[in-house]
Amino acid sequence: MKNIRNFSIIAHIDHGKSTLSDRLIQTCGGLSDREMEAQVLDSMDLERERGITIKAQSVTLNYKAKDGETYQLNFIDTPGHVDFSYEVSRSLAACEGALLVVDAGQGVEAQTLANCYTAIEMDLEVVPILNKIDLPAADPERVAEEIEDIVGIDAMEAVRCSAKTGVGIEDVLEEIVAKIPAPEGDPNAPLQALIIDSWFDNYLGVVSLVRIKNGVLRKGDKIKVMSTGQTYNVDRLGIFTPKQEDTTVLECGEVGWVVCAIKDILGAPVGDTLTHQHNSATEVLPGFKKVKPQVYAGLFPVSSDDYEAFRDALGKLSLNDASLFYEPETSTALGFGFRCGFLGLLHMEIIQERLEREYDLDLITTAPTVIYEVQLTNGEVVYVDSPAKLPPLNNIAEIREPIAECNMLVPQEYLGNVITLCVEKRGVQTNMVYHGNQIALTYEIPMGEVVLDFFDRLKSTSRGYASLDYGFKRFQAADMVRVDIMINSERVDALALIVHKDNSQYRGRELVEKMRELIPRQQFDIAIQAAIGNHIIARSTVKQLRKNVLAKCYGGDVSRKKKLLQKQKEGKKRMKSLGNVEVPQEAFLAILHVGKDK
């Protein structure tokens, strides 16, 4: 056991985590040169296309160190985006140490900090590593000082390497062996295995990634899931070398995968503890704190026949992604679907793409909203995650919106732009610290504003240099109203949105204009209106298509023309009372882009 090292690789987006993982695998001979490819751990097509890591992946490698011993390294490559930070905290729970990778050109960024603090809170040994020293812009001395100054860990001794060219990778491995402690645990105690991750395999059922904390797990053991009390047989177990390899036993302190022919998706929840059926452990291992979704959106299948398939797909996906929340929802405009909760907009995009690709579904998404706390006049407090569920205005005492605490690291020359952006988003500054050329800004900004397009705009006003990390802080009373969109004086529930009163006129007007461009012309006038309660704040009309009924009267009497026009007018009126308007998919997405084109 003293030769096992469990560690994660944490870093900001694009600081080279996945490339470093590739080099470690190559150096330790996990894959032959023929099987080696770039970002070998990013196995999903989506990850390859976007060049980001979404799911944490684990690998077991054997490394023969300079002291002649052979060490077993279990490491987990983690994502860098804010939206996937729960993946990082889950990975860290299975480790004793973490490699903090910092780009020697870019320096410390917000996510570096956030992930590092998560690791320190969990009492992990953090080993700083300066990556990309082959770049002309690299300045390892400055960055080492920055790490000490901002993060507060000693970085003068930090290993300098270049994951791309392979310089200094040996030193990284030696550093891991020297600095990261061996796992603690008792191989003779009752079995306790923590489920770090699960996914659904069509042939094997549920496959779980586990970390053995105490005891030993063998093939053929009878095991029990502690939260449900269900018992299963261990059919297969093994490790990833990145390929799935079968073994017969997982020793204390190891990380590996287990298949127990669990067919039920809820059979082995992530964060649960596995133990033996007979000599079972009494205590459950501390799991992970449940992540609360920050953004909610309705997902509806385009054709209602896909509803069942959609439900199964969501179930299988939520097994693999513990932070996805969903419940059934019906909408008059879109039929049956689900209200889903996500950690952020990127997470929402990824989930929608995975559903469309892996499960072959066509989906319509409604505009994302955050969750509001509503105090009713009778003293009751309700939580509203969709504009359609907002109680009538006269029953509401006050609406409280969620406030996010945003930590940003900004280079000095972009400070002005970033502050202007934060103020425009109704932000309140709470802190500002200078670290050399970088400035650490802390703002409290309403979650609804952060979620919409804050990240994109922050990147564009600072030319990509500012970085952001945010988390939910509290609910705070605000003057929020619901803007309804009416088409031919019928409310379309899927288009309603909750906005701050100051922005309501502007958002309503803009949305109505957008809808006018997107709704195709019909045989009759279509009135599109935005309303708060019964008060109309904006209107525009999609003009009707009409035939020129006077074409066949050459000259002729004016009363004849009047008669024909009158007849056409009555026909149109009848059509309007019977006709209903098709709202195209683009119109539902228009809400997302309101206010982006300025």
Curated annotation (Swiss-Prot):
InterPro entries: EF-4, EFG_III/V, EFG_V-like, EFTu-like_2, G_TR_CS, LepA_C_sf, LepA_CTD, LepA_IV
Pfam families listed in its UniProt record: EFG_C, GTP_EFTU, GTP_EFTU_D2, LepA_C
Biological processes per GO annotation: positive regulation of translation
Compartments where located: Cell inner membrane
Residues the record lists as binding GTP: D14, H15, G16, K17, S18, T19, N131, K132, I133, D134
Assigned EC number: 3.6.5.n1
GO molecular function: GTP binding; GTPase activity; guanosine tetraphosphate binding; ribosome binding; translation elongation factor activity
Matching SUPFAM superfamilies: EF-G C-terminal domain-like, P-loop containing nucleoside triphosphate hydrolases
Record has Ribonucleoprotein as a keyword: no
Membrane topology: Peripheral membrane protein
Disulfides per UniProt: none
Gene3D superfamilies: 3.30.70.240, Elongation factor 4, C-terminal domain, Elongation Factor G (Translational Gtpase), domain 3, P-loop containing nucleotide triphosphate hydrolases, Translation factors
Keywords, in A-Z order: Cell inner membrane, Cell membrane, GTP-binding, Hydrolase, Membrane, Nucleotide-binding, Protein biosynthesis
Family from the record: Belongs to the TRAFAC class translation factor GTPase superfamily. Classic translation factor GTPase family. LepA subfamily.
Protein name according to UniProt: Elongation factor 4
Species lineage: Bacteria, Pseudomonadati, Pseudomonadota, Gammaproteobacteria, Pasteurellales
